[in-house]
Amino acid sequence: MNVIAKSVAVGLLAMAAGSAWASDGTIEFTGEITTSTCEFANGDTVNVELGHYSNTQFKTVGDKSPTTPFTIPLTNCPTEAWKHVDGSESKSFQLWLETRNGGTTGANNDLVAVTGSATPATGVGIRIDRASDGAQLALNKQNDTPVTFDITGEQTDVNLQAYYVSTVESSAITAGEANASVDVTIDYR
């Protein structure tokens, strides 16, 4: 091999080495797989009867029906504290509520859209709060300010409340079934 060919080969190798991608950062994942997580104690469904209300009860946007308290009984909960993503250590969790079918009302993404088998009502949605203080639970995302629930033992009750909220004036509400389903995930982060 002549000197020119060797020089070209060395030059090409040097150029290839110089074009390597530089890293701007690293993503490090941490977590834990647990053997004990809370489960719904009485099957995987909690039924909540919100009641029957006249559209005239909702005079303006934001009017509410009476609250309906309900409990999600949990069993097999962890009894030892664990470290959360914020660095704190406790026996607490958040609920991740994921809407189904109708999603959210659109006018207010914090209200569950109602559905019905025949003709669903319009102009109302369902709000879900922590019962102890009325802190609203976010839908399809985590709350900006965490709404946590403490684990008090292997059996723990999650006390919530729900109610209808109008998204339009009374005259624009249409009568019909006002049902909804929300999937619940217990979030230990």
Please describe what each predicted stretch is.
Residues 2-6, 21-189:
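Mature extracellular/passenger domains of Gram-negative fimbrial/pilin and adhesin proteins
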